[in-house]
Amino acid sequence: MAALMYNVSRGLVMLGERSLFQRERYQILVNSRRFLRGLRRRPVAVLYPDGERETLIKSKRATDITSQGFTQKGKARKDVTERAAYKNCSGFVSERAEESSQINKLKLAGLRFEKAPAGDNRLARVSSVARSRAFRDKEGKVLLEGRRLICDALSAGASPQMIFFSLLERLQELPLDKLQQAKLIKVKYEDIKLWSDLVTPQGLIAIFSKPDASRLTFPKDARLQSVPLFLICDNVRDAGNLGTILRCAAAAGGDRVLLSKGCVDAWEPKVLRSAMGAHFRLPVFPNLDWDDISKHLPKNVIVHVADNYSTSTKQLVSGQTENVSSDDYSESDSDDDDDEEEDEDSLPHVKPQVYHECWAQRSAALVIGGETHGLSVEALRLAEETDGKRLFVPMAPGVESLNSAMAAGILLFEGRRQLLMLSDKLRRRARTKML
């Protein structure tokens, strides 16, 4: 009996411990931290056990406030919807109003313009094609960019065909009375920036008929200050150099510029940018044969050439010889210089002279050669026939040559100085005779 009671008590103890352990284990599970998202709920209705619903009785003032709030919200939404629909249908009101006011101003000058639609490729097509020399020669069109260059072209009498602009203010900066025959197209500034060669374009690109120098009207003040000095470019193939040469010729008051075949096109965009409007300040005749060049010069003109490369010039600079005779071109003193001397034997004989000595005493023409090929035989022959000189600029030892544009600037302004001094001398003589 004692043994039975012992076993029963032991079993109860074990059962209690097991339940205790389970309780503690379950308690751990229940008391574990659980991060649950809190939800905010709002009761829809209150139901009582008898099935009735709770009804909320609002005052008349609360009802009026609620209905008034809903009415104001609905009206605001309606206004926003109508405003958006109006914008979608008629475009931005401010832009249209501004354009309409500007259009009224343009109507006073009798002008109309069109706005390029989305996907319009006229600017892209014209800009890419107008930069081709073959297209310019075939179609007779040139591309001008920027307000100043376009204004110079219009003032000289050039004929505009199409003008692309980004803002109406840019268009009004041009002389509107000279745009009657042009087609005006308003495009986005991003399109002009895409097809322009400039980093920061002004928003104006124009297509002109290729100007003819014989039909242009040049500024009277520039022509009155001109001197009988003619510039001939011989195989100048660098666009930047040619543009700078044209600019120097206009600044020095040259009479005209003649470009031989082999020169870069005078209407190349880079030439136009470098010349800074010189095309419309003095006549420029491009793509001429040497026979045509002679026809553009007066009969009593003396043609000089700019050259620093001849052996006689180097000897004169170094002080070895003072006067170079024709015998120096026919005989050689050493076998090392046979090739160089033989080359000069075959060339026309033109005496060298320092540029600051007297050489422009009447109508004078100056030939500037390209840096790659130098002077042509035709240029030297023309200088020989007119008793011209081979002009050179002395330089410090170790310097091979000057840039062609720099040499042209030095010689052109020296020629202008000599011609103006001659004119003043003749004027003083005439006054003395009158007295």
From Swiss-Prot:
Keyword Flavoprotein in record: no
GO molecular function: RNA binding; rRNA (uridine-2'-O-)-methyltransferase activity
Binding residues annotated for S-adenosyl-L-methionine, in chain numbering: 369, 402
Keyword ATP-binding (UniProt): no
Catalysed reactions listed for this entry: a uridine in rRNA + S-adenosyl-L-methionine = a 2'-O-methyluridine in rRNA + S-adenosyl-L-homocysteine + H(+)
SUPFAM superfamilies: alpha/beta knot (SSF75217), L30e-like (SSF55315)
Cross-referenced Pfam families: MRM3-like_sub_bind (PF22435), SpoU_methylase (PF00588)
Stored Gene3D superfamilies: 3.30.1330.30, 3.40.1280.10
Location relative to the cell: Mitochondrion
Biased amino acid composition, Acidic residues: 328-345
Biased composition (Polar residues): 314-324
Leading EC class: transferase
EC number(s) stated in the UniProt entry for this protein: 2.1.1.-
Keywords: Methyltransferase, Mitochondrion, rRNA processing, S-adenosyl-L-methionine, Transferase, Transit peptide
Domain of life per record: Eukaryota
Region (Disordered): 314-351
Transit peptide segment: 1-42
CDD domains from the UniProt entry: SpoU-like_RNMTL1 (cd18106)
Membership in a protein family: Belongs to the class IV-like SAM-binding methyltransferase superfamily. RNA methyltransferase TrmH family.
Function: S-adenosyl-L-methionine-dependent 2'-O-ribose methyltransferase that catalyzes the formation of 2'-O-methylguanosine at position 1485 (Gm1485) in the mitochondrial large subunit ribosomal RNA (mtLSU rRNA), a conserved modification in the peptidyl transferase domain of the mtLSU rRNA. Also required for formation of 2'-O-methyluridine at position 1484 (Um1484) mediated by MRM2.
Protein name per Swiss-Prot or TrEMBL: rRNA methyltransferase 3A, mitochondrial
Native species: Danio rerio
